[in-house]
Amino acid sequence: MMKREDVLMEALPYIQQFHGKTIVIKLGGHAMVDPEVLENAIKDAVLLHYVGIRVVLVHGGGPEITEKMKALGKESVFVGGLRVTDQETLEIAQMVLVGKINKGIISLIAKCGAKGVGLSGSDGNIILAKKMDLQKVNVQGVEQEVDLGHVGEIEWIDPSLLTTLLDRDYIPVISPIAIDRYGGSLNINADTAAGDIAIALKAYKLINMTDVDGVMDAKRTHVFRKLSITEANALLASGAIGEGMIPKVSSVIKAVENGVKYSHIINGNVEHNLILELFTHEGVGTMISLQ
């Protein structure tokens, strides 16, 4: 068992390496419905902030949106890991993401003594999007086109507001609701939003906190510790990646292809996994890099 001082000394070179760097953290999965898990994740994020890392949080809320829809008697439908979003579903998503989850995260940051600013992607035109094209889906052997409704495809990220907040020692917290060119709102997949924000900010790392230990093989028995983007793309092409993981893996691949040095997928339900990933030699989860 390592001594406490050894743990701290192991962290020192990583603290030095990441000081002043931007790290985008996507909060998702069970953390969005379990207050204890979420609070632990926020404590870790605030610790990163206090050791000089420029932290940006992007949160999802899929399980809580699904739960709210169920309570209102509305069924959730997914195509390729994306939620089909009619007008009523969009309003529910906005209520849950912006009105509840985002504000709750800001309160937790304040409780830890830091300053957070809650934003949706439509604030300051951070995320400009267009309505997603019809999606092809195979239904009982027949290919059909499905309209996902008010689901957006990101056209542009304007990082200027986020950079201003980071420069002034705030932690930006972003919910994945975008704006289109006509002032309308669009639901954006939070994994995709986090990846594109990381690219726009020229982040050093993108960390996706979810409900699984990392990227797994087809049998779901082995977690890949490291993957190149070539290996990760091959896993996607082979069908080994489950539907819900497709946007996560796709977003981290895109981030690395576009200048983010490292992307990670880790289990956010395990206490202090974020700290273990960043500040220990072994790390946790799956790391994806160019090679």
Curated annotation (Swiss-Prot):
Source organism, top-level taxon: Archaea
Catalysed conversion reaction: N-acetyl-L-glutamate + ATP = N-acetyl-L-glutamyl 5-phosphate + ADP
GO molecular function: acetylglutamate kinase activity; ATP binding
Localization in the cell: Cytoplasm
Keywords for this protein: Amino-acid biosynthesis, Arginine biosynthesis, ATP-binding, Cytoplasm, Kinase, Nucleotide-binding, Transferase
Any one cellular-component term (Gene Ontology): cytoplasm
Protein name: Acetylglutamate kinase
Gene for this chain: argB
